[in-house]
């Protein structure tokens, strides 16, 4: 059985991530749902965007939490991907939910991005939009900040929630594809052996150096927001505890319906998916973007793949499942019976059937 295909930030390989056009395109490509990120503006608006910084997706430098909804709505969030998406606007949570409501079968994995001021009204504001748009049944609320999920469960017990857990800290801090492209590299840990050669040139380039500094700062801010009030040592201990996922999830004072982790975890911690299934918890893996990854992960019992390639992942999965399906047994050859005497012809015919 093919796992659910959930489009990471929409069809983000083909369209600007986390925009309405990306969500539409994902469902047109046959995805079972979309994943998106919601965060709060300085005037308590709710917008769909992954990073706090907007530098990678607009022509200005800024942070979502320092800007108003009006400021953000004036910006072009599409041209960075391709000129055909010029003037694509940042989506509000309300707009995104209304769109997904119109798309039959669209499950939404909605990630809560922690507020920098630990605002206790953030989760209630999100839940109110889900109520207003009648999207409670279609949404799975996910977050790395498990305190936010606990609050959501207390306020809306019927809402499904999913605990996001960290993979390797190094991979979390890796720059996104657009920065690797600027450095003449691809994106991934495989490039670490050649990155040293690119760093002197990029460090001498004020623009590239600025991008890298702002990117790392943004990621560290996000990590601190997910563990408010904790020292770096306490944060590290928390991350280490997450390596034994069944034990960590059992230690929570609420029960998530889903756990979502980096797909490499499936290679490092054999059996954890089955263990979570025994606890009644489903598992999604991110970010599954290659045919090789699909082939290997189909050996696990993961329930969903979060992917930037909803246009290809289902095709790869179905191809692999067809290739590894047990061959149908060929019926044994039946030797025709000798013709029966005329008086027994009917009986013989019946036996041959």
Locations of regions flagged by a protein language model:
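Phosphate-group recognition and catalysis centered on beta-loop-alpha active-site segments
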Residues: 1-353
